[in-house]
Amino acid sequence: MHRRTFIKAFTLSASVIAMGMSFGVQAAETIKVGIMHSLSGTMAISETPLKDVALMTIDEINAKGGVLGKKLEPVVVDPASNWPLFAEKARQLLSQDKVAVVFGCWTSVSRKSVLPVFEELNGLLFYPVQYEGEEMSPNVFYTGAAPNQQAIPAVEYLMSEDGGSAKRFFLLGTDYVYPRTTNKILRAFLHSKGVEDKDIEEVYTPFGHSDYQTIVASIKKFSTGGKTAVVSTINGDSNVPFYKELANQGLKATDVPVVAFSVGEEELRGIDTKPLVGNLAAWNYFESVDNPTNQTFVAAYKAYAKAHKLPNADTVVTNDPMEATYVGLHMWAQAVEKAGTTDVD
C-alpha cells in the first residue's frame, strides 16, 4: 500500500471511529425514559392521553435543563391492550433500550403482567391509575388511589342523604382483577353497614364489551326492589356504549345514579352527556379543580395538543391518571436530582 493511500485509509478509519465515539457520547448525554401505554386496542381511548401528557412533561423538564444536566429521551412502545405483550415491552425497555424508568400501564392486569419483569431486572415503574391495593413492590410507585381512598368514600356518599340514600347496589365491572377485588372489598364494607347479599348484584363483562342493552334492563329491574345505585368499574372504550345505553333506556341519575371509578373527561368526550347529568365519578383529580397550579397545567396541555396537532386538539381534556403521570414524572426527576443518580437502589 502506498504511503498516501495508507494515510487516507487510516484517516477514514479514525474518522469513523471518532464518529462512533461521538454518537456514543451523545447517547450517554441523555437519560432514556420509557412510556408504555396502549395506543391501540380497547384501552387506547384511556391510555393514549397518558402518553401525550408524558411527552409534554418531558419537553417541559428538558426546557428547564433536563435532569442531572442531561436531556430526557422518551422511548415510546405500544403494548396494544395485550397483557402478555406488556411484559415483553417492559423487558425490551429495560434490557434493550436501557431506560432509567418507565411510566405506564392502566389496568391492574397489565401491571401484574409486567411486575415480575421489573422485579427481576430491578427496573422502576410509575403506575398512574387507581388500583385494588393488596400489592406492594419496591419497584413500583403507585400514584393512583386505593379502594379506601376512592371506592369506599364514594359508596359512603351514595348511602348518605346527600348521595340519595341508596339501599341496593349494582356492581358492574370489566372482568379482571381490579373490579373483582374492589367489589370484594365493597361487598364486605356494605355487609358492615347492614346491606344484605340480596341487595347486592355483581355483573362482569369482557374487555371491549359493547352491548349493554340486557345489562341496563337488569339494572332497571333490580332497582324496583328499593333505592339503587350503580357502582361502575368498567374500563376502556366499553364506557361509551354503556353510557349511551343508559340514555337510550331513559335511566336517569335521579332514579338510579351511577358512580364510576374508571371513567373521566376523556372517555365521555365523544358522547352526548346531557342525558347523563347527575351521574358521578370518583377520582383524586378533575380538570375543573380551580387553583393556579391546575390552570397552568390545563393550559399547558391544551397548548401542547394544538402545537403537536393531537387528534381533536381543540377539545382535549385532562383527567386524574394524566395528572398522576405529570406529577409522577416531576417527582421522579426531583428524586434523581436529589440522589445524584438514576440508579433504582
Language model: regions and residue ranges:
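Extracytoplasmic "Venus flytrap"
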Residues: G34-V53, V77-P84, W106-V109, T174-R180, ...
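Periplasmic-binding protein-like
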Residues: L93-C105, F126-P128, R168-G173, G225-G236, ...
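N-terminal signal peptide c-region/cleavage motif recognized by signal peptidases
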Residues: S22-G24
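Beta-alpha junction/loop-to-helix N-cap segments that form part of ligand/metal-binding clefts
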Residues: I45-D52, G65-E135, T143, T205-Q213, ...
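Extracellular/periplasmic Venus flytrap/periplasmic-binding protein
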Residues: E88, N139-Q249, P292
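Signal peptide-proximal N-terminal region
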Residues: A28, D52-P74, G164, S192-D197
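Extracellular/periplasmic periplasmic-binding protein-like sensory domains
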Residues: L246-Y326, V336, G340
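N-terminal export leaders
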Residues: R3-I7
